[in-house]
């Protein structure tokens, strides 16, 4: 059961991050505009660095999740990124900023999924993804897996 759960969660998270990164990689100016839309005071150089590196971080995390390599580090990095995303979208939601989160737009799959790009929808989605990441970390580090030598 654990192997199936690990594979399903890893695949879901991996595909999500891979798609998110690929959707941004060729559009640094749109990503930069999204960074600025959160109205967080950042030096221009840092905002630009985020816009140019974030897609690649998401792609690397997606590939690492899909391949299952370096899972403790991969899960820690995934959780850290999701915590940062959650803090950003939550503050935008709290401040009622009328922005698009600048994240993966799934509205092409179904129009109702456009709500996931609002600050509130993105916050809830990020919390769900963070929960999946925590669940995956618990399953991967479970005593049964350690006792059988699986890691």
Placement of each model-derived feature along the sequence:
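Membrane-interfacial helix-loop segments of redox and metal-homeostasis proteins
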Residues: 1-148
């Amino acid at each position: 059961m654990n192997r199936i759960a690990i594979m399903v969660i890893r695949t879901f998270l991996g595909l999500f991050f891979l798609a998110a990164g690929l959707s941004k990689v060729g559009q640094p100016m749109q990503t930069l505009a999204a960074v600025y839309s959160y109205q967080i005071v950042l030096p221009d150089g840092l905002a630009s660095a985020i816009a140019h590196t974030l897609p690649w971080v998401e792609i690397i995390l997606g590939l690492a999740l899909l391949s299952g390599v370096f899972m403790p580090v991969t899960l820690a990095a995934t959780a850290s990124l999701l915590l940062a995303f959650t803090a950003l979208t939550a503050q935008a939601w709290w401040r009622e900023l009328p922005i698009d989160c600048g994240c993966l737009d799934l509205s092409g799959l179904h129009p109702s999924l456009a709500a996931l790009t609002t600050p509130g929808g993105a916050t809830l989605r990020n919390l769900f993804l963070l929960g999946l990441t925590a669940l995956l970390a618990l399953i991967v580090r479970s005593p049964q897996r350690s006792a059988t030598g699986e890691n």
